[in-house]
């Protein structure tokens, strides 16, 4: 039973949002990490660098103990201080960096994850060194009500053109995961699905 549960999450990426957690965030993350998702992206964009670093140190340790990849979100200096070799970037942040900064990022990180919303974003991300793409928004979500999802055709179009793994985001759950994978995605990202598990 436990092996089956872990297997069903092997193509998922857990995106954190401690504001969705009822109870202790670290306890929730322990539960999530024990499910062995493909990776965790520690988002928590509202925290100061110092607060984020304190939290990241704990989450990175949990992930290391369980053999789960952990990406820090946009905090390159924090990642460098903590020895984390995985970073997740948004396209606007990536575009604001000069070529020298992007080159340094490619040297410092073994995996670079980038959020994309169009073919142009994907091309830019890959050119800048992305090793995986987080593609959204595929289905309508709770956190972005009213924003129409781009659908499975969009996933297929991007996956066909993209030389690196693509993970779909936006309204993804375990029932929809096979649909995005059939469209060519390597897997899917879940936020509320993991924060409320």
Give, region by region, the residue ranges found by the protein language model:
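Active-site-adjacent loop and "lid" segments of alpha/beta metabolic enzymes
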Residues: 29, 145-148
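Acidic (Asp/Glu)-rich catalytic clusters
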Residues: 29-35, 64-65, 103-107, 126-127, ...
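Glycine-rich phosphate-binding active-site loops on the catalytic face of alpha/beta enzymes
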Residues: 14, 90-99, 134-146, 172-197
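N-terminal amphipathic alpha-helix/helix-capping segment at the start of soluble metabolic enzymes
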Residues: 1-27, 92
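Catalytic beta/alpha-barrel core
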Residues: 15-18, 38-51, 60-99, 109-123, ...
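Generic hydrophobic/aromatic pocket-lining and core-packing "Φ" positions
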Residues: 29, 56, 60, 76, ...
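Alpha-helix-loop-beta-strand connector modules within alpha/beta enzyme cores
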Residues: 53-72, 100-118, 148-173
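Catalytic cores of alpha/beta
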Residues: 70-85, 117-129, 161-162, 166-167, ...
